[in-house]
Amino acid sequence: AIDKILNGEDVDLSDAVFVYELEPGEGAENGIAASKEGAVILTNLKCYLLQADNGVKKVWETSYKSVGAKESKEGDETTGGGLAWGGGCSPSLTKDLVMFTDNQDPVNLIAVDMKTGEQVASMPVIDELPEGTQVSVENSAIVYDDGEGTVSTIVCNWFGAGSAKLGEADNDSSI
């Protein structure tokens, strides 16, 4: 259907929309990325590579652990974190890797092989903070692949990235 759409042809999409059902308790809230390999979906429990042509084909799935949402306490001057359960971020892609965070304590950056889904690396990020500092990764990691074997990433802490007084008159979302 996509080739026909790109060629400007009229297309009946009723046979081109497919559904992949997740397990009970599993949800995909904001973790979606696409490449020529397929769609990478990050749920609160797993990372998937799906392809769709005449139905949905699961190429691989990789489980990971997460602690879910993180909340501010009453009286805090900043908002909390955890806009979504699970990794909290959308997957970042290179030609060979899918990278995402797990929102554990400390937060880990996980890299899985794009072709197989096998976890090839995991390391703590944003872990050299004072005791009790909350961390919530809510944006995709910035990824740079130099094409010669070095992949660099930047992961940001978004916990408290907005004003808790947003609902009050004369306030905005800045800290």
Model-derived features with residue positions:
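Extracytoplasmic/lumenal domain signature
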Residues: A1-E29, A33-I175
